[in-house]
Amino acid sequence: MTVRSFSGPAGCGKTFQLMAALSGVLRERPLQNGEKVLALTFMHGSRRRLDERLAALPISQSHYECSTLDSFAWRLVRRWQTLLLSIGHQVAAAADYELICAQAAELLAHRVVTLWAACAFPIVVVDEAQDLTPSRLAIIQQLANHVELLVASDEFQCLSEDLRPNRACEWLTGMGGEMVLAQPWRTNDRELLAAARAVRDGEPPQSGRQFKVVSTPNAGMAATWISNGISWNRQGNRVAIITPTMGDFARSVHTWIETRTTTRGNGPHRVLLEESEVTRCDRFLEGLALPDELEARDAHALMEGHPRTIGKAFTEWVDRQRRCQGRTEFTRNEVEMTLRQLFSNQRRMNSGDGAGVRALTVHGAKNREFDVVFVLWPAAIGGDAVQKRRLLYNAITRARRSCVVLAQSTRALQAPPFV
């Protein structure tokens, strides 16, 4: 079996090359009955984009599965839990993703498990491999000797300081068969390309017409830039407000845009605020009067006044537990874990990007593209100089047509990633 990998800067067509390579493999080795292509990535946003790419190939939807690595690992652990118990491990809780992946990797060390996986999925595609933690990388390494493995990665797009040096990228380079891509395809705007290249190379990005770095000491000034930009933007374009952290500065800007009008008469504008399921669930639990023991008959009352989709999913779960297992009481910890899983499921099923304006973090914007990008750069950002360059690079490279960086602190403009 072979390992082929594609690496290079953002927007250079790594995922495109993955799909082209997959098409070539399928021509040389058509799938047999019961076989599927397995496409894996770390985050749900990347999974949705990968799923869209797979749907465009001349391959039946029944012949591929697109999943996060965590979901695949959970499926593996559940299927082989008897073996897991026999080697002295209890099945990890559904929300303990790191342990689930570690257990899945340990199971794949057993030949019977690896051969089962290889028979079901003789071709495995992995996107955004630079984000793989050691346990997730171990899953891919166990599969590598038994499947056709196609991988895309870019070490500089890894936003976790804990993954430096990047073991996944080092392993892929050491395996050989790596194609390094350099030609950008996401945008042909010279200013955007030059700014991204400068940040990546540790040099100061230069402002121009389509790329600008602006000092905006207060939320009102930053919001005015964005609100005017939204109004002057062509209808139908996808606009993103991207920030390293959704802190006070970003939230104040978001509120201003949605409630105020600029001196030029622009605004207010509706902005879809994207948050991680962890943040949303934490806020949901804070507002929930959750008892230590929940009676099944009280589940509906507990969900009153809360988002209908989550409330409905939770009460249906309680009803299933009551009907199938005769349960009438649930602990606080069990309820919290179930709600966290429901929020995660909801994020997984969200649709792709459409026209409009959305606010999100750099992490949430990974592997996505927008016509117009505004980057909110707050005064305080954690991490070393390299980390800050990676954050800014990942934000700038989401833009296809224009990007404006709005820095809260003038002092920040005299330090990396701006110098």
Predicted regions and their residues:
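The feature marks helicase ATPase cores and/or their adjacent C-terminal helical subdomains
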Residues: 1-419
